[in-house]
Amino acid sequence: VYKIKNKNKKIEELVNMFKLQEVLKQKAKTLSGGWQRKLSIAISLINNPKILFLDEPTLGLDVIARRELWSVIEQLKGKITIILTTHYMEEAESLSDRVGIMSKGNLIEVGTPQELISKVGANNFEEAFVKIATGGKE
């Protein structure tokens, strides 16, 4: 935080983006899982990274906290590159410009959700994922 130009402005921007005003005076360890997740992502953005890695950022969050985090991720799209891992197909489809599907540690397919649906003749993204991940052997 010491070498950040306009650090107070940046902190205020992140507090507003993540709606952290109501928990500013609390210690991080006393926050719920959702608030802790939002705080950790906000902290990771303080130095204006070009790439942000999010490993299952909504795991264990309730529906409302998950949607709030999705909203923040949507706000970040186009400003930085986000690499996000998830087991939730709805999340991958909703938040991603491009999706990479991995199986047994190997990247086996990359494309937009719609490209992947079309490629395997699926009715929806989850069906496309299953067909690709299993090699068509459901």
Question: What does each of the following model-derived ranges do?
Answer:
Residues N6-V23:
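Conserved ABC ATPase "signature" region
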Residues K27-G34:
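Conserved ABC ATPase signature
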Residues N48:
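Conserved catalytic motifs of ABC-family nucleotide-binding domains
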Residues L52-D55:
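Catalytic Walker B motif of ABC-type/P-loop ATPase nucleotide-binding domains
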Residues K79-H87:
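Conserved H-loop
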Residues V110-G111:
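ABC ATPase "signature
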